[in-house]
Amino acid sequence: VQRGEHTVVVTPTASGKTLCYTLPVVAAAMRKQSKALYLFPTKALAQDQVAELLELNRAGNLGLRCHTFDGDTPGDARQAIRLHADLMVSNPDMLHQAILPHHTKWAQFFENLRYVVIDEVHTYRGVFGSHLANVLRRLQRVCAFYGAKPQFILCSATIGNPKAHAEALVEAPVTAITESGAPVGEKHLLLWNPPVVNPDLGLRASARSQSVRIARVAIKAALKTLVFCGSRTQVEVITKYLKEVFDRE
């Protein structure tokens, strides 16, 4: 990223992908009048990113202006965002319908646009992916009109062809980062065979009762615990059992 190359980062969850683009984007915005556009496929993800950026901004007293620009953005706030946002978080639909067609109003933003961050790129496949690729072509043409050539930083969950997928979206060579350098704690894999409760009939204890038993032991040992079930009903049943167990204790 620091070399100015288009980059796609494909590493596991909680491996620090967000920092891969947040640090260079924030550093560039602080050094000079540099803008960044973040694109997320859903409003929920966009709101989460804005919350993290605002927290970082407050903690470091950075003075950066970070805003969401989506369908819920009030009309009176849109002009201020166009003129003053350093980091703008949006989605492909808004870029297509509300930003690019009115690029003359966004001239100041596009002139200084240095980074375009696209998260969750594994979701952009099929027709949706084709639409995004065309929108990005339009974005690059508009940026070229204003004398800007933004660098693309893409992030994805694990996929088989990150480099080819990213290059198809941005139509340019992309460097793929596929190895995580994040520290990983020691792991133990245990396969649990429920005990036999009726030898004559060959019946074993239910998976539900054993899941509750194991989860109870783990929680009492202050271990972070996730229990995956095959259905929502099973999740609700196990949650109910665990609540009853701990309420009694």
Report the location of each language-model feature.
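Conserved helicase motor
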Residues: C66-R78, P92-D93, S180-G181, G230-T233
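Conserved helix-turn-beta segment of the N-terminal RecA-like "Helicase ATP-binding" lobe
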Residues: L45-D70, L139, A168-V174, F246
